[in-house]
Structures are given as structure tokens and as C-alpha cells.
């Protein structure tokens, strides 16, 4: 009974941390409170912009400089399930579909602060459980029982720490400021405002990854130095502008870029 109580105590922070996100039915306009999320990935979607007299201002990021209205701003529809989010670009035929992982879109600094908070709670829980074990030993003098429970407590504590700190280890793998040329199409689908996606000359910027992308005027939209991280099971890019902000997605995304998956498989074989 005592072991069950200790396990419950240690599990509460982890259970709270792994909450599910409410589903969202298909719509062309996300809830206002979610603009920051959708307009980070789908920042060329029309619902992110307020355009008047040819000048467009970003609804989600008020400090974003205005840009001229052009073909970069497209009509989109979105929907969400518990484990993934999808947005469709409907103003282009054939329609293009992109998938992102909803629970992992989170400000890196805030994410790390949350992990530190739960780590402290787990530590306090560990101390409390140790006190309970000590009291139990003093009362019943059952050293063997206390040792079994102590081992169980330590294992549970370490497993909880591994679960919480897993994502903080990402920076130790394959980090670079400029991705390989063969991967530009992949990275520039998500991090399209990263400066490695654009070739700017005389105030006009052309997209390096998508040759059919119309040129746009150089502006603050293209101002981020980005760092990319490529892991075996997921990729992330980090914006370096005032505050670090990390976004994570599966390396195989977007799913319609089959050439990227095939290229990676060929490299593994070689």
C-alpha cells in the first residue's frame, strides 16, 4: 500500500505534463488564442494577416513589420487531432497539405522552465517519500521492506527524470546554421522566414528552395538567423532573434515531400 502511494505521488507531475490538446474541426480561421501557434508554421496563410490598401499586418505577432500584399499570402484551412495538426493551402492547385506535431510547438524557454518546475516537484516528492520510509522503519523495524520500497522509489524517480529531460538533450546532436542544399526544401517549408531560405539582392528576395515562389521585397519577415537540429526521429529549428524559440517536427515532414524520404533512405544504404 505504501509503495502504491509513493508511485502515485511521483506520477502526478508527469501525468499533468502529458495532457492532450482539444480537437479542432476543419476551419479557415483558428481561434484567436491559437494564432501564435498556427501563424508560426502557416505564417503565409491569409488568416494571419490583416490586409488593407495593399499593406498587410500580422495578427499574431504585433512587432512584425508590415509587408506588401502579394501571392505569398494564401488561403488556408486547418484542423487538429490530439497528436497532430494539419493545414491545407487551398488557393493553390493541387492543394498542398502540411502536418505538424501540436504538443511539441512550444516556446523553448517556457518549455524548459516547465520541465524545471516538475523536476522540483519530483525532488520534493522524493524527499517526502524518504521521510515516510524512515518513519515506517522506525515504527516497524522492517529493514527489508524499507529497502525494497527505497529501490522502487529510486527507479521511479530516475524514470520520471528521463521522461522530462529527454527533449533537453536535442542540442547535442547535428546542429548547424545552414542545412545542406538537398534539405532546403524540407527546412524552408517550416522555417520559411529563416534567412538561409532566401537570396536577397537590391531589396528583392528570391526563395532558394522553391524556384516558382514569386520574389518578395526584403523586409523584417526575413530577419531570423536559424539553427537546425537533425535527430534520428525528429528535426527542429531554432530562431535566433531577441529570444530563442525552438520548433520541433518529424524529419519526414511535410509528408508529400517523398523525395526527401527517398534521399535519406539511399544515403543510409550507401
UniProtKB/Swiss-Prot annotation:
User: What sections of the protein cross the membrane?
Assistant: 118-138, 146-166
- Signal peptide limits: 1-26
Which segments carry the B repeats? Answer: 147-270
Residue ranges in the Cytoplasmic topological domain are: 139-145
User: Where are the disulfide bridges?
Assistant: none
UniProtKB keywords: Early protein, Glycoprotein, Membrane, Repeat, Signal, Transmembrane, Transmembrane helix
Q: Where in the cell is it found?
A: Membrane
The record's gene field reads MGF 110-1L
Q: What role is this protein assigned?
A: Plays a role in virus cell tropism, and may be required for efficient virus replication in macrophages.
Q: Which residues lie on this side of the membrane: Extracellular?
A: 27-117, 167-270
> Its membrane topology, per UniProt?
Multi-pass membrane protein
Q: Which family does it belong to?
A: Belongs to the asfivirus MGF 110 family.
Matching InterPro entries: ASFV_fam_110 (IPR004848)
The primary site where this protein sits is: membrane
Q: Single GO cellular component annotation?
A: membrane
Q: Which residues are glycosylated?
A: 75
This chain belongs to which protein, by name? Protein MGF 110-1L
Q: What residue spans do the A repeats cover?
A: 27-146
Amino acid at each position: 500500500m505504501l509503495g502504491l502511494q509513493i508511485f502515485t505521488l511521483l506520477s502526478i507531475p508527469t501525468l499533468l505534463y502529458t495532457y492532450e490538446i482539444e480537437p479542432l474541426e476543419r476551419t479557415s480561421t483558428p481561434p484567436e488564442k491559437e494564432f501564435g501557434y498556427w501563424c508560426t508554421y502557416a505564417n503565409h496563410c491569409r488568416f494571419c494577416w490583416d490586409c488593407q490598401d495593399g499593406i498587410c499586418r500580422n495578427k499574431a505577432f504585433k512587432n512584425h513589420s508590415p509587408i506588401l500584399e502579394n501571392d505569398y499570402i494564401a488561403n488556408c484551412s486547418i484542423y487538429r487531432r490530439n497528436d497532430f495538426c494539419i493545414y491545407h493551402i487551398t488557393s493553390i492547385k493541387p492543394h498542398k497539405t502540411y502536418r505538424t506535431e501540436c504538443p511539441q510547438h512550444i516556446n523553448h524557454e517556457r518549455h524548459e522552465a516547465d520541465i524545471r518546475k516538475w523536476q522540483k516537484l519530483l525532488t520534493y516528492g522524493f524527499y517526502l517519500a524518504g521521510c515516510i520510509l524512515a518513519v515506517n522503519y522506525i515504527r516497524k523495524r522492517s529493514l527489508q521492506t524499507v529497502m525494497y520500497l527505497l529501490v522502487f522509489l529510486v527507479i521511479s524517480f530516475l524514470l520520471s527524470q528521463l521522461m522530462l529531460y529527454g527533449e533537453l538533450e536535442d542540442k547535442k546532436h547535428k546542429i548547424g546554421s545552414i542545412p545542406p542544399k538537398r534539405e532546403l526544401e524540407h527546412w524552408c517549408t517550416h522555417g520559411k522566414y529563416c534567412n538561409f531560405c532566401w537570396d536577397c539582392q537590391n531589396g528583392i528576395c528570391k526563395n532558394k528552395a522553391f524556384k516558382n515562389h514569386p520574389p518578395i521585397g526584403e523586409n523584417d519577415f526575413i530577419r531570423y538567423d536559424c539553427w537546425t537540429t537533425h535527430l534520428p526521429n525528429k528535426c527542429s529549428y531554432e530562431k535566433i532573434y531577441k529570444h530563442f524559440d525552438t520548433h520541433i517536427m518529424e524529419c519526414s515532414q511535410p509528408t508529400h515531400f517523398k523525395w526527401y524520404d527517398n534521399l535519406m533512405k539511399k544515403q543510409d544504404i550507401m
